[in-house]
Amino acid sequence: MSNMQKKTDVILIGAGIMSATLGSLLKELAPEWEIKMFEKLEGAGEESSNEWNNAGTGHSALCELNYTSEKPDGSIDIKKALKINEQFQLSRQFWSYLVNSNLIRNPQKFIMPIPHMSLVQGEKNVTFLKKRFKALSNIPLFQGMEFSDDPEKLKEWMPLIMEGRTSNEPIAATKMESGTDVNFGALTRMLFEHLQNKNVELNYKHSVENIKRMKNGLWEVKVHDMNNGKIEYHTAKFVFIGAGGGSLPLLQKTGIPESKHIGGFPVSGLFMVCNNPKVIEKHHAKVYGKAKVGAPPMSVPHLDTRYIDNKKTLLFGPFAGFSPKFLKTGSNLDLLGSVKPNNVLTMLAAGVKEMALTKYLIQQVMLSNEKRIEELREFIPNAKGEDWDVVVAGQRVQVIKDTETGGKGTLQFGTEVVSAADGSIAALLGASPGASTAVNVMLEVLEKCFPQYMEKWEEKIKHMIPSYGISLVENPKLFQEIHTSTSKTLGLSKKEAVYS
């Protein structure tokens, strides 16, 4: 078997935004390293990164209310919002570096300026939004945020949402002009095209079957070439598993101690997409509501202007669903296959703890199209069923693990890196905020897995990402400079915005 092994420095598993970002960073920091990528599907960005499989929001906590929770004393906890905003600034800087270096072109193909708004109804929620606005609006990262509870002003901001609204219930919104819509599918394809130009070997229709540690410390990756049915063995010093929902089963195959006692719970998503151009033209924003009491964070409803295939469109959702598959193109045995002796108690504990989530998912699965339209009418009172079609979005595998605070079988709602103690292998697990924070997450992979190179790489990283290692909250002048320059490079300045 050893004579069939093909050696390389780095193996990337999965052709999504995470592998694309890590590959792009490594090619700038260590251009001499040999990199190979293996993807089961026919092209890049076909699963979770695909533009139809995620919300396409440049998550920076400008409008997502689940990133600012209310404390027991009634004050607003903004720590998570600041963290997510800072992380998105890192992504903007790296993308700008790639554009300025002519490594990728035409940023309008993957990022567009779009106002981000939060919308709430009811006195209690209006009070919450007002407090949130006060807590954030003085912070440089949220400069320019506007608040209004005046129905006339709200008609200017969101005419489609206010049209035909007869309720006397208090209503309020905040607005940030500096929001973005990101086509992560287009960006992923651009990055892999760039990596191909940098001699990264891209292998599509190649399914990774196994990953095991060899006696010499290298990792052996068993690959099924679906083009000809042959089995190949590739070895590398470092392996990154960026396979979306497929990451957990592959991580389990490595046998590393860090892969134990982790489970995954798949949640599928549906969106409603508008097919009426007249309705689409009446809305120009990403408007996020507030999750209903008892509903999980991934259930926050939003009405989004999106740019897909250079065309303006309008989506509403998400509606959650349940499928045992870990990937949209996965198997119905994925969930069952992920239950191992080392995580069965963790999974069972989560099952007992998360009865509310289970109930919510069952209710969502049972929703008829008419019921979905009723939920849509909370946003668009005049919505007509014939103007909207249902599209199935991607699968998200929420991480289940034992934590000190939550105890056994705690469901996680973030994105996290799991790596071997020696840094030779890393996997990305979890969901939101996901793709928006890809650069921050991949910098974390570099720090965890290549600590011996970080001193050497630091100067180059800071050249690409000027705020690396610096808090923008504490350096408002630097934030202003970075925000202005990235807006200009990415075509996000108001005067430069071009809409299709």
Curated annotation (Swiss-Prot):
Q: Which UniProt keywords apply?
A: FAD, Flavoprotein, Oxidoreductase, Tricarboxylic acid cycle
Region forming the signal peptide: none
EC number(s) recorded for this UniProt protein: 1.1.5.4
- Give the matching InterPro entries: FAD/NAD-bd_sf, MQO
HAMAP family tied to this protein: MQO (MF_00212)
- UniProt keyword Acyltransferase, yes or no: no
- Which pathway is this protein assigned to? Carbohydrate metabolism; tricarboxylic acid cycle; oxaloacetate from (S)-malate (quinone route): step 1/1
Q: Which cofactor does it need?
A: FAD
Q: Which SUPFAM superfamilies match?
A: FAD/NAD(P)-binding domain (SSF51905)
Q: Which reaction does it catalyse?
A: (S)-malate + a quinone = a quinol + oxaloacetate
Q: What is this protein called?
A: Probable malate:quinone oxidoreductase
Family per similarity comment = Belongs to the MQO family.
- Judged by the first EC level, this protein's enzyme class is oxidoreductase
Q: Which GO terms describe its biological process?
A: tricarboxylic acid cycle
